[in-house]
């Protein structure tokens, strides 16, 4: 399970430079959840794309329906105290803090391309590239080898 923010959802359902990567995120983990406000944020992002003449209004409506039908599996309520605390501590908007708060409450990653969230909440926020990268191998701590003289002590030299 991951928390999917609005930009991940838009990249998944629209033709963008990040669409292929968003599809790979979905293939790796298809259980996406978001706070209730994802709908308004996706609609706002699609409207922004329409106003920039990147898509017509019919395509924006279709993209929203695709996001609603195919991407977000679960929607969760947030604790307002936690949201406001995250917003205050990380310097985020309450909108962005909803996603971070949800990821922390569920103990999962928030996959986002929002640079401020990635910078201020590295405990839960991952870019698509980070999420798709293989995990770092565990660090192996090796004991310092004993000096040759110590290792040879007690052995006979016949």
Identify what each model region corresponds to.
Residues 4, 33-34, 94-97, 112:
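Short beta-strand scaffold positions
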Residues 1-37, 49, 53-58, 142-158:
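Short, well-structured N-terminal submotif of metal-dependent ribonuclease cores
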């Amino acid at each position: 399970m991951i928390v999917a923010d609005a930009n991940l959802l838009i990249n998944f359902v629209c033709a963008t430079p990040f669409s292929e990567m968003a599809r790979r995120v979905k293939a790796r983990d298809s259980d996406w959840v978001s706070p209730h406000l994802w709908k308004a944020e996706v609609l706002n992002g699609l409207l922004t794309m329409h106003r920039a003449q990147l898509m017509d209004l019919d395509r924006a409506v279709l993209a929203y329906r695709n996001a609603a039908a195919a991407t977000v599996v679960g929607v969760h309520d947030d604790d307002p105290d936690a949201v406001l605390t995250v917003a205050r501590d990380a310097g985020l908007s309450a909108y962005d803090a909803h996603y971070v708060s949800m990821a922390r409450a569920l103990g999962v990653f928030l996959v986002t391309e929002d640079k401020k969230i990635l910078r201020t909440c590295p405990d839960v926020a991952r870019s698509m590239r980070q999420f798709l990268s293989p995990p770092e191998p565990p660090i192996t701590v090796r004991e310092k080898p004993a000096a040759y003289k110590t290792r040879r002590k007690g052995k006979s030299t016949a």
